[in-house]
């Protein structure tokens, strides 16, 4: 670990105290380690446009882990995950939940595999594939989408991934009311949650959708 570990640990702990999240010291250590790995790899592989570690803690870690308390399924697929967002922070928060992390770029998948190795995460499976081409060998019961596509596109591209009892979780900024109104036939919104992220301006919404 680099010499900013103590600084980042303190900063993340302060952010977490402003929420009702229950996060162990080991989990904080893993989350900080993840940020340090993004920062290190970003210099070569351009994994994210966020360049400073302080912003990464907010925009990548806090913005992801506030979702944890709203997930109840056993196996999620995070589509268009990039470097593992929100899937890896959520996997750290929910060690009993399995996450398939799907991205089409090999450099991102290689990074996520290294994260799994270094942080000893056995509940993530990074996969390189386009979402419309992917067929899971496992039973999936939840789809996660963060800044990935419109609701219509997400549902059209991902509906083959889960069964009729599965849940689609779309993470959005401003509430996309027009997208909700234009949902394709056969789908229904069951819950809309306004997420609170300390120190982060702008709206954050979680939208749960099921097959109807």
Swiss-Prot record:
Its EC number is 2.1.1.170. Specifically methylates the N7 position of guanine in position 527 of 16S rRNA. NCBIfam families: rsmG_gidB (TIGR00138). The gene is rsmG. It is an enzyme of class 2 (transferase). Belongs to the methyltransferase superfamily. RNA methyltransferase RsmG family. It catalyses: guanosine(527) in 16S rRNA + S-adenosyl-L-methionine = N(7)-methylguanosine(527) in 16S rRNA + S-adenosyl-L-homocysteine. Coiled coil: none annotated. One of its GO terms (cellular component) is cytosol. The keyword Nucleotide-binding does not apply. SUPFAM superfamilies: S-adenosyl-L-methionine-dependent methyltransferases (SSF53335). This is Ribosomal RNA small subunit methyltransferase G. Its main location: cytoplasm. It holds the Pfam family GidB. It is found in: Cytoplasm. The keyword Cytoplasm applies. Keywords: Cytoplasm, Methyltransferase, rRNA processing, S-adenosyl-L-methionine, Transferase. S-adenosyl-L-methionine binds at residues 80, 85, 131-132, 146.
